[in-house]
Swiss-Prot record:
It comes from the Bacteria. Belongs to the YajQ family. GO terms for molecular function: nucleotide binding. The keyword Nucleotide-binding applies. It comes from Campylobacter jejuni (strain RM1221). Keywords: Nucleotide-binding. CDD domains: YajQ_like. Nucleotide-binding protein. The lineage of its organism: Bacteria, Pseudomonadati, Campylobacterota, Epsilonproteobacteria, Campylobacterales. SUPFAM superfamilies: YajQ-like (SSF89963). The keyword Nucleotide-binding applies. This is Nucleotide-binding protein CJE0423. HAMAP family: YajQ (MF_00632).
Amino acid sequence: MASEHSFDISAALDKQELKNAFEQAKKELDSRYDLKGIKCEIDLSEKESIFKLSSSSEGKLDVLKDIVISKLIKRGINPNAIKELSRESGAMFRLNLKANDAIDSENAKKINKAIKDSKLKVNSSIRGEEIRVVAKQIDDLQAVMKLVKELDLELNISFKNLK
């Protein structure tokens, strides 16, 4: 039995789930009656995890956003992890949505502070885009997992490498 147990907190997105949500959103776009006759498009830039939505109507642009968000929720991706990058208008209305796939330093500090303030017997350290949590008892690690899930973060939190 190991004397210390640990796990990593990260915000990594499953790229395949992102792609699946994109495919499902495109399929729904093709079959929606209220979008017939209106030029609407959904594209995904997989490298940057950016959804590019465009429509000839501003109201339908919000419908496209709702479709994408609902498909992401069904695929298990936290909707708070999606940020609106830019909204452009002209002949076509465009909207770019970015999926957050890393813990930035501000959120890492917030998570680390919450863990330290909990008075649990754990050690946490920020390692780039991940936070390593170490404890002698697995119960303490599970309490930290529960604590982090309850924090109001705009990230898709995942726990990895529980040892």
